Regions:
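Alpha/beta enzyme core
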Residues: 1-133
Length: 133
């Protein structure tokens, strides 16, 4: 599986903080894509497919949801989404601030991935949602 479309994103923050892997003087833009460049994102996935990837993934998933269908169409490969730490944390924070039920928010975010034709979803909420399936 290839992180074929990995954007430079602020939504990686919570994971980087916990893993103590925040860039210090290191620019990840050499391998992370600019968020606004849809064409570059799709071309990155096409290149990964040409190099032998058998599954493709967009990351962060929620902010890349518009790409899933296009990548599948261009590559004919199963394409999924990774709901990264910041996206997952935002659902938890909404719930803690009484802006919604955590499971309902999580379920909605996952249903939208499926509606966007995601073949698989990676989420930090997998254990939580599994209790409700």
């Amino acid at each position: 599986m290839s992180y074929s479309t990995k954007f430079k994103s602020h939504f990686y923050g919570p994971f980087r903080d916990v893993a103590k892997s925040s860039p210090k003087g290191f620019d990840r833009s050499s391998y992370q894509l600019p968020v606004a460049d849809k064409k570059k994102a799709i071309n990155s996935s096409i290149n990964n497919a040409a190099q032998g990837a058998n599954y493709l993934m967009v990351k962060p998933g929620m902010t890349s949801i518009d790409l899933i269908k296009d990548i599948k169409k261009e590559t004919l490969l199963p394409t999924g989404a990774f709901q990264v730490s910041g996206e997952f944390a935002s659902l938890q924070m909404l719930s803690k601030a009484n802006f919604g039920n955590y499971i309902d928010l999580l379920r909605e975010s996952l249903v939208v991935f499926k509606r966007a034709q995601s073949d698989f979803i990676i989420t930090y909420g997998a254990r939580d949602i599994a209790k409700y399936l």
